[in-house]
Amino acid sequence: MTDAQIALRALSDPADLEPLQPLYEHSDGPSCGFLQGLLDQSHCRAWCLVKDNQPVAAIWYQCVAERAAMVDLRVLASERRQGLGRQLLWASLTALGDVGAVELEVRSSNMAARALYKSLGFSETGLRPKYYATPDGREDAILMTLTLNHGGSAT
């Protein structure tokens, strides 16, 4: 058996979204229409992780001045628990270059994502009470921040 070929690919054109459709089916995150609009803006930075020529994960940021807000990080359901989210997040943090800090929000119940972010140096910096809708009501959003040096690594 051969090892899978994994590569980081920048997203820069609306045509780049078509292969990402399986990542966004049945999701409560941003729609492909929203992401296409975001990709059209100069402050968007986005990448996907490609495994054996198929996109298996994607990450999106809005960058203003020296700050980046992570809009979405998503891994194909069948590819989760293999370290691909960590690999994509780390590669994107390096590729952000001159960004001084990355901010994100995550559902309070998403313990796997929170653990991933903490393991890479993000710290919890705030709370948005009852921010997300759930089948049973509302759920808090945890705000997290990572300060980077200008080489893209955590400080």
Language-model regions: role of each:
Residues 44, 139-143:
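Short hydrophobic/aromatic beta-strand or adjacent loop that forms the aromatic wall/cage
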Residues 76-87, 107-115, 119-120:
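Conserved glycine-rich acetyl-CoA-binding loop
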Residues 97, 112, 134-135:
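Short secondary-structure boundary/hinge segments and terminal tails
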Residues 103-105, 118, 123-140:
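Conserved catalytic-core motifs of GNAT/GCN5-like acyltransferases
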